[in-house]
Amino acid sequence: GRVRIAVAGAPPPTRTIERVETELGWQFSQLYGLTETAPLLTINRPRPELDPLSAAERAAQLGTAGGPALGVETRVNEQGEILARSNVIMEGYWSQPEETAKAIVDGWFHTGDGGSIAENHTLIIADRKKDVIISGGENVSSIEVEGAIFSHPDVAEVAVIGIPDEK
């Protein structure tokens, strides 16, 4: 058998996923969830349709949050925020009805994460909504900037952190 690695939280850079497969021979899976949605909302794991792809192409596919877990519905609203509903989502924040009302609207939990849904119905997480950088009218996620920098072969580690600006 192969060693399997499951990563939850922000996906590692595509290059790291590729190296896990090619250099270590491990099988990579990506999970997405929040404390409020315990244990998870989506899962992305190797599947037969990825087999013909190159290691780099497979890594790019596996770096997304994947498809909804059993019994979970996800969508992205007009503002680009990821919403979810299922029976695993919290009923509310303890003794915080106002915060609960902000987080759960019309039965949909607002994750606070920005993202999109790809043509193959996988969820792509862009960034935490509050970490998006607005430059020249364009929304740029810190994850995208990290990925671009990390793709350079001389870069071993990188972290991009958005800092609020008056502009």
Question: How would you describe each model-predicted region?
Answer:
Residues 1-60, 73-79:
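Gly/Ser/Thr-rich phosphate-binding loop
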Residues 18, 63, 98, 147:
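Active-site phosphate/pyrophosphate- and oxyanion-stabilizing loops and adjacent acidic/basic residues
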